[in-house]
């Protein structure tokens, strides 16, 4: 009986190999794996001794040989297969233990060159996986070190000296083969994504459109898109209790999928969706910000002049809609302080997200048993996530480049805006318009955002027509609406929303423009003396 072992991740390989050796397996290995086994007192046959060819081309060719792959692919029940093995002096290989070069870890480093990435594309190991998995009825393929323990126990307890593998059922071998194929598939997907450069936006690209939210990114979508996600854990249930769900993460990235849970119960499906919305919203701002999220929509958001205002920023965000804040998700883009923790502790929240927490703030918040406290360091960075937006649809998927973050100071960020009315906004109104426009990107369309002093006053989200969203804002905002500014994520098709804005004493309006009735809308704004600005860009969010 023969076992071939060639692993990059050597965790547990020595202990597992000792079990195989004790059961009479001839251990075949190569390179660093062979050295590790020999150093631990195991007898190993080098692959080069089996193939009668040395490793060559800087190790690129090791196991690619008929004496290896013939031993993996032969079917013992076929007489002509056995005849070929005998003719060419090839011995069957019953167990293959392989895991691949760390391609994802390598290319996740910014300093990695193309040449370094290419050298980390595994050829021999990948081929071993495919050959062994194809013949899973006769070959046991192991790619996951976590499987060593149970397989080792089965082999060790086997009483059939002529067929040790009979202790592993055919169904179990099939599952191991499936895991191996998935391991190889995810590896190929990582290589494909790297080589095709399907990072639709990156820091350099976004800086290239600084001061605008025009997604003028030169993107050529690939003919075949292979998303790479690895299962992190099962979730209690999905969006509703009768739905099953699991969380998958994209290796080498941050975000909500890789958040560190410091305290509280496991995240639910809905917690993760809301947490992701909170993270995206606070990363929109380069100053101290706090957002309150409910069902992926902001119901409160505010920014401060400096970081020392964090507690006050939270209070302003909360007061945007105190009723909706209950049971919501909080997001911060600065380390959460004790003062802020004290201010929010009396309100029930499901989740808090921050780049970090002071020791005393974490201790205080941890007294709330059901509160989930997440650390996401990149929440403090105003850097665009590089993953494309992916939406599954029946029979396919949609990909798009992300709606980029708006960067720069007031002048830079609004340099392409156009005042279209007789009256012009004041500088403070322009600050509030920019704030509201940034927020509108994170509100479900049709979206209307009212703000004052860079704080949300009211939000109208997800309505089938725009005037309904405006009307909701007026009712939710109440007396606070007077003197606030209004942002609309898309153009006004009719002047009725301007009439409603006037009734609510709205001070100023920002919208993309582009309607065939733009002039009617402008005329209505001029009629009421309301300054209005066109951005030239739309912020739909479906």
Curated annotation (Swiss-Prot):
Gene3D superfamilies listed in its UniProt record: 3.40.140.20, Methylglyoxal synthase-like domain (3.40.50.1380)
GO cellular component, one term: cytosol
Binding annotation for IMP: 30-33, 60-63, 122-123
Transmembrane portions of the chain: none
Localisation: Cytoplasm, Cytosol
Keywords linked to the UniProt accession: Cytoplasm, Hydrolase, Multifunctional enzyme, Purine biosynthesis, Transferase
Binding residues annotated for (6R)-10-formyltetrahydrofolate, in chain numbering: 496
Keyword Cytoplasm: yes
Binding site for 5-amino-1-(5-phospho-beta-D-ribosyl)imidazole-4-carboxamide: 236-237, 295, 327, 350, 446, 466, 491, 538
Recorded catalytic activity of this chain's protein: (6R)-10-formyltetrahydrofolate + 5-amino-1-(5-phospho-beta-D-ribosyl)imidazole-4-carboxamide = 5-formamido-1-(5-phospho-D-ribosyl)imidazole-4-carboxamide + (6S)-5,6,7,8-tetrahydrofolate; IMP + H2O = 5-formamido-1-(5-phospho-D-ribosyl)imidazole-4-carboxamide
Active site positions, chain numbering: 134 (proton donor/acceptor), 295 (proton acceptor)
Record pathway: Purine metabolism; IMP biosynthesis via de novo pathway; 5-formamido-1-(5-phospho-D-ribosyl)imidazole-4-carboxamide from 5-amino-1-(5-phospho-D-ribosyl)imidazole-4-carboxamide (10-formyl THF route): step 1/1; Purine metabolism; IMP biosynthesis via de novo pathway; IMP from 5-formamido-1-(5-phospho-D-ribosyl)imidazole-4-carboxamide: step 1/1
EC number: 2.1.2.3, 3.5.4.10
PROSITE patterns in the cross-refs: MGS
CDD domains in the record: IMPCH (cd01421)
Molecular-function GO terms, alphabetical: IMP cyclohydrolase activity; phosphoribosylaminoimidazolecarboxamide formyltransferase activity
Site feature Transition state stabilizer, where: 294
NCBIfam families: PRK00881.1 (NF002049), purH (TIGR00355)
Subunit organization: Homodimer.
Family in the record: Belongs to the PurH family.
Record text about domains: The IMP cyclohydrolase activity resides in the N-terminal region.
Protein's recorded name: Bifunctional purine biosynthesis protein purH
Lineage, broadest ranks: Eukaryota, Amoebozoa, Evosea, Eumycetozoa, Dictyostelia
């Amino acid at each position: 009986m023969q076992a071939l072992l060639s692993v990059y991740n050597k965790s547990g390989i020595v202990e597992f190999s000792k079990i195989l050796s004790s059961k009479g397996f001839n251990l075949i290995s190569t390179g660093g794996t062979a050295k590790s086994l020999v150093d631990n007192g195991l007898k190993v046959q080098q692959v080069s001794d089996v193939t009668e060819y040395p490793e060559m081309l800087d190790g690129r060719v090791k196991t690619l040989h008929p004496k290896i792959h013939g031993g993996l692919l032969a079917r013992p029940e076929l007489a002509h297969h056995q005849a070929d093995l005998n003719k060419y002096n090839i011995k069957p290989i019953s167990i293959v233990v392989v895991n691949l070069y760390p391609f994802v870890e390598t290319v996740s480093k910014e300093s990695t060159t193309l040449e370094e990435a290419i050298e980390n594309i595994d050829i021999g190991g990948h081929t071993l996986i495919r050959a062994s998995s194809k013949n899973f009825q006769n070959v046991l393929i192991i790619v996951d070190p976590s499987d060593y323990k149970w397989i080792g126990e089965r082999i060790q307890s086997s009483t059939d000296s002529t067929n040790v593998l009979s202790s592993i059922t055919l169904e179990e071998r099939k599952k191991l083969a499936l895991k191996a194929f998935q391991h190889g598939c995810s590896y190929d997907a990582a290589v494909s994504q790297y080589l095709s450069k399907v990072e639709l936006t990156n820091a350099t690209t976004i800086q290239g459109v600084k001061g605008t939210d025009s997604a003028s990114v030169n993107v050529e979508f690939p003919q075949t898109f292979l998303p790479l996600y690895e299962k992190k854990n099962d979730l209690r249930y999905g969006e509703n209790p009768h739905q099953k769900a699991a969380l998958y993460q994209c290796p080498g990235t941050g975000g909500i999928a890789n958040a560190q849970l410091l305290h509280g119960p496991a995240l639910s499906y809905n917690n993760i969706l809301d947490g992701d919305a909170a993270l995206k919203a606070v990363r929109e701002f380069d100053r101290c910000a706090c957002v309150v999220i409910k069902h992926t929509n902001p119901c409160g958001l505010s920014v401060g002049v400096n970081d020392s205002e964090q507690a006050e920023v939270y209070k302003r965000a909360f007061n945007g809609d105190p009723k909706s804040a209950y049971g919501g998700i909080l997001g911060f883009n600065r380390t959460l302080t004790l003062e802020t923790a004290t201010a929010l502790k009396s309100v029930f929240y499901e989740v808090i997200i921050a780049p970090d927490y002071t020791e005393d703030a974490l201790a205080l918040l941890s007294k709330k048993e059901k509160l989930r406290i997440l650390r996401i360091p990149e929440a403090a960075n105003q850097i665009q996530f590089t993953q494309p937006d992916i939406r599954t649809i029946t029979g396919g998927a949609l990909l798009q480049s992300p709606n980029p973050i708006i960067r720069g100071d007031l002048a830079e960020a609004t340099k392409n805006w156009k005042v279209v009315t007789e009256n012009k906004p004041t500088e403070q109104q322009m600050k509030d318009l920019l704030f509201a426009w940034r927020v509108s990107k994170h509100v479900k369309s049709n979206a209307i955002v009212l703000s004052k002093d860079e704080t949300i006053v009211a939000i109208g989200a997800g309505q089938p027509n725009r005037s309904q969203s405006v009307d909701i804002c007026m009712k939710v905002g109440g007396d606070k609406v007077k003197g606030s500014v209004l942002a609309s994520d898309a153009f006004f098709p009719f002047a009725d929303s301007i009439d409603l804005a006037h009734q609510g004493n709205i001070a100023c309006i920002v919208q993309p423009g582009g309607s065939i009735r733009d002039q009617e809308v402008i005329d209505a704004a001029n009629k009421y003396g309301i300054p209005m600005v066109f951005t030239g860009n739309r912020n739909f969010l479906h």
